[in-house]
UniProtKB/Swiss-Prot annotation:
Membrane topology: Peripheral membrane protein
Record protein name field: Di/tripeptide transport ATP-binding protein DppD
Family listed: Belongs to the ABC transporter superfamily.
Enzyme class: translocase
Record's GO cellular component terms: plasma membrane
UniProt lineage: Bacteria, Pseudomonadati, Pseudomonadota, Gammaproteobacteria, Pseudomonadales
Originating species: Pseudomonas aeruginosa (strain UCBPP-PA14)
Positions that bind ATP: G39, E40, S41, G42, S43, G44, K45, S46
SUPFAM superfamilies: P-loop containing nucleoside triphosphate hydrolases (SSF52540)
Protein task: Part of the ABC transporter DppABCDF involved in the uptake of various di/tripeptides. Is also involved in the uptake of phaseolotoxin, a toxic tripeptide inhibiting the enzyme ornithine carbamoyltransferase. Responsible for energy coupling to the transport system.
Residue stretches making up the ABC transporter domain: 4-253
Record's catalysed reaction(s): a dipeptide(out) + ATP + H2O = a dipeptide(in) + ADP + phosphate + H(+)
Length: 324
């Protein structure tokens, strides 16, 4: 059984007539699996995970057939029941560590707060465990950093502190939302290596939200590609990179600079992602898709399974007779 199973998730901001920012999403993650969610800004990647964590506030609202994590339907859990899971069995590392950390408290206090709440540690054991966590995320001179405030740390150090807080209770699922945003290339590589080492050591599932397809190709076992709030393709690595089945996935891969060597321009799709007031009747990619036919413009395709994953397209690429 999957550790995480999301069925027909929708997220709206406003009333029931509002256009969903996430629409009909199905997604699963197995224990110990590394799943990447990719797509351009505004595709619904972060909102999907915030809905799972219970972080969508009014006027936003969440609906789903179920949001099942480790046997619990997160939609039906009350506040206290949810708090026993979120932050303990399921944790999240946010995009910007400088805003994710509270500037009014030392990093040691913030790590200790997680340990007090979820593990019940007190006194010397609490302090020692906080120190061990800083050492585990490879912060130099960890003992002296316990009493430091977030503004006294670099971006890379702050991200390591955020990771230490997230893994403090040894979660079964860690969600990393653009964990290398605003970090230089060297630090990005170190943070990704750290996350993957922790994932292997603790045998936890990892959901990686990213724009970086190179990172995905090197680290993920499966990929969910999102466009305009929908999952358009789900597949394994490297098959999804070698033989993408959705035109949008193909376009993302073609836009990688290394694939455009010698060209005057990067490969791009014409047009822009549809907004609230210009969503097409049919497939959301149809106004931009080079393969679109009249059927695509009139009806919206469902996400259909095939032997290598799933695709939301009437005329999938590289499949021949594989569609179930």
């Amino acid at each position: 059984m999957s550790l995480l199973d999301i069925k027909n998730l929708s997220v709206r901001f406003g009333d029931t007539t509002a256009v969903p920012v996430v629409d009909g999403l199905d997604l699963s993650v197995d224990k110990g699996e590394v799943l990447a969610i990719v797509g351009e800004s505004g595709s619904g990647k972060s909102v999907t995970m915030m809905a799972l964590m219970g972080l969508i506030d009014a006027p936003g609202w969440v609906s789903a057939d179920h949001l099942r994590f480790d046997g619990h339907d997160m939609l039906t859990l009350k506040g206290r029941q949810r708090r026993r899971i979120v932050g303990k069995d399921m944790a999240m590392v946010f995009q910007d560590p400088m805003t994710a950390l509270n500037p009014s408290y030392t990093v040691g206090y913030q790590i200790e707060e997680v340990l007090r709440l979820h593990l019940g540690l007190r006194g010397k054991a609490l302090r020692q465990r906080a120190l061990e966590l800083l050492e585990r995320v490879e912060i130099p001179a960890a003992a002296s950093r316990l009493d430091a405030y977030p503004h006294q740390l670099s971006g890379g150090m702050s991200q390591r502190v955020a990771i230490a807080m997230a893994i403090a209770a040894e979660p079964k699922l860690l969600i990393a939302d653009e964990p290398t945003t605003a970090l230089d290339v060297t630090i990005q590589a170190q943070i990704m290596e750290l996350l993957l080492n922790l994932q292997r050591d603790q045998d936890m599932a990892l959901i990686l939200i990213t724009h970086d397809l190179a990172v995905v190709a090197e680290t993920a076992q499966r990929v969910c590609v999102m466009y305009a709030g929908e999952a358009v393709e789900i597949g394994g690595v490297p098959a999804l990179f070698d033989r993408p089945t959705h035109p949008y996935t193909e376009a993302l891969i073609k836009a990688i600079p290394e694939h455009c060597a010698g060209e005057a321009r990067l490969a791009t799709l014409p047009g822009i992602v549809p907004g609230r007031y210009d969503r097409p009747r049919g497939c959301l990619l149809s106004p931009r898709c080079p393969y679109a036919q009249e059927h695509c413009r009139q009806e919206r395709p469902a996400l259909e399974a095939h032997e290598r994953g799933a695709v939301r397209c009437f005329y999938p690429l590289n499949l021949l007779n594989e569609v179930a």
